[in-house]
Amino acid sequence: MALYAIGDLHLSLGTNKPMDVFGPKWANYVEHIQENFSRLHDDDVTVIAGDISWGMSLEQSLPDFQFIDALPGKKLLLKGNHDYWWGTASKMEKFFAEHEITTLDILYNNAFFYGDHAICGTRGW
């Protein structure tokens, strides 16, 4: 079991806002994310520290959540300043349950226990 952190995925699988407009370093970045996550195991935990999806609503962000959900391990989501889709924790948990998204948890004014450690999340910007 290992703990990882990444931020600023800026996924746009449900919107037309590709990141490669910001330069060639962003070309095929979704494939690179998938390739690097393939090294993880199902008992690993990844903190995704905000700016997850360019979607403006939960529905518009659904393809991004499904992509992340399909990656190995548990993912803890923190709110970023571009995550306009972010609602209340209960609304998001209900949305995830309705769409059978099972590996994503919200980390916002709560804690997730990882072994002997607690991972806490709140807005820091």
Please report, for each region that a protein language model flagged, where it lies by residue.
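Beta-strand-turn-beta hairpins that frame and shape the catalytic cleft
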Residues: 1-4, 11, 111-124
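Short glycine-rich loop/turn motifs that provide flexible caps or phosphate-binding loops at active sites
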Residues: 6, 49, 79, 120-123
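Short alpha-helical hairpin
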Residues: 9-15
